[in-house]
């Protein structure tokens, strides 16, 4: 069995245009989910772990969480959804809103894992503020 273990889907609604314009960056096009699944299946891939990426602290954007939801709804037997959250808020404190979002995705929406990106979220993986997130994931 072949599984693509890490890929991102793009939805242009998730990007903050003023931030990208200010930095001279182009916003990528939406991922064509049907075409992507066709290509992956043609390559022998049976499942795909897909995830967004929370990048609010650096880019004031998130990388396609909406697209993950759409893809999983359309192809629930193909996509394995992961959510992505920044666990620490702008003031360096526990991010309750993102914690609640993550728990809902894992417990009620069929999500199977979580992507944390310390460089984008500007936190350390061993920060004690992370522990409640790890504990919720471990349940």
Question: Which residues are covered by each model-predicted region?
Answer:
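Active-site gating/metal-coordination segments in enzymes
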Residues: 46, 58-139
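An N-terminally biased module of ancient metal coordination in phosphate/nucleic-acid-related enzymes
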Residues: 1-63
């Amino acid at each position: 069995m072949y599984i693509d273990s890490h890929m991102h889907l793009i939805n242009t609604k998730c990007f903050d245009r003023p931030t990208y314009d200010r930095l001279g960056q182009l916003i990528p096009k939406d991922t064509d989910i049907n075409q992507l699944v066709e290509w992956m299946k043609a390559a022998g891939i049976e499942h795909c772990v897909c995830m967004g990426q929370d990048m609010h602290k650096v880019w004031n954007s998130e990388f396609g969480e909406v697209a993950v939801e759409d893809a999983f709804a359309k192809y629930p037997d193909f996509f394995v959804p992961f959510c992505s959250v920044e666990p620490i808020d702008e003031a360096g404190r526990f991010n309750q809103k993102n914690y609640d979002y993550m728990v809902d995705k894992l417990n009620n929406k069929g999500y199977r894992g979580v992507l944390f990106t310390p460089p984008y979220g500007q936190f350390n993986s061993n920060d004690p503020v992370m522990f409640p997130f790890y504990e919720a994931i471990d349940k």
